[in-house]
Amino acid sequence: MNYRGAQNLIKRGDEQGLRTALEGNLSSNTSNHKGWSLLMLAAVEGSVPVGRLLIEKGADLAAMNLKGETALSIATQKGHTAFVELLQEV
């Protein structure tokens, strides 16, 4: 699975589909050409279950996109308090 496929799973909140992809050939640290990681996409959506899964599978919490944003800064900007709390628990 590629970034675009994972992006669609995250937008739909398909935790099981993403789990299957991560158990296959998808890395939890996959990113696009702008540096957007899968965890950042989950932060945009505010999806705590997806975020938790990505963290369990080794997603880099400190990864930055080309604008210098992290999953934490994105979740904070979007007002996704539960997602922010998830990231701060780790």
Predicted regions mapped to residue ranges:
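Conserved ankyrin/ankyrin-like repeat signature
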Residues: G17, P49-V50, A82-F83
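Amphipathic alpha-helical repeat scaffolds
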Residues: Y3-K11, R19
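Ankyrin repeat start-site detector
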Residues: H33-K34, L66-K67
